[in-house]
């Protein structure tokens, strides 16, 4: 299964319209750098995802984890429209959009 991949500008527009952006990276990765308004929901606990009536957009660092786990993410979305941020936070940053960086946090494990 694959989920539709969205460009950063599409994700930004959908967030403004009420979509939920979910960062499936581990907590340490999210603490180090994150997209504003993204909620951390590590992949390891994705089955405990809170329900959301609107669209859900998942992201990771590069897009590999979201695409590899697309079926699992769609199941966790419980019928909500589900998408992925193509290229993950790397694409978001490369498009010139801001991220929140906390240099005090240790470097993430998934490098």
Give, region by region, the residue ranges found by the protein language model.
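Rhodanese-like catalytic fold shared by cysteine-dependent sulfurtransferases
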Residues: 1-20, 24-56, 64-111
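Short, surface-exposed ligand- or partner-binding patches at beta-edge/loop junctions that are enriched
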Residues: 59
């Amino acid at each position: 299964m694959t989920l539709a991949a969205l460009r950063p500008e599409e994700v930004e527009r959908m967030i403004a319209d009420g979509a939920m952006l979910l960062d499936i990276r581990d907590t340490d990765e999210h603490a180090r750098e994150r997209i504003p308004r993204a909620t951390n929901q590590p992949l390891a606990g994705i089955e405990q995802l809170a329900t959301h009536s609107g669209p859900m957009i998942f992201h990771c660092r590069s897009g590999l984890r979201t695409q590899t786990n697309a079926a699992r993410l769609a199941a966790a979305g419980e019928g909500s429209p589900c998408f992925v941020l193509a290229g993950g936070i790397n694409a978001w940053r490369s498009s010139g959009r801001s991220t929140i960086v906390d240099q005090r946090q240790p470097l993430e494990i998934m490098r």
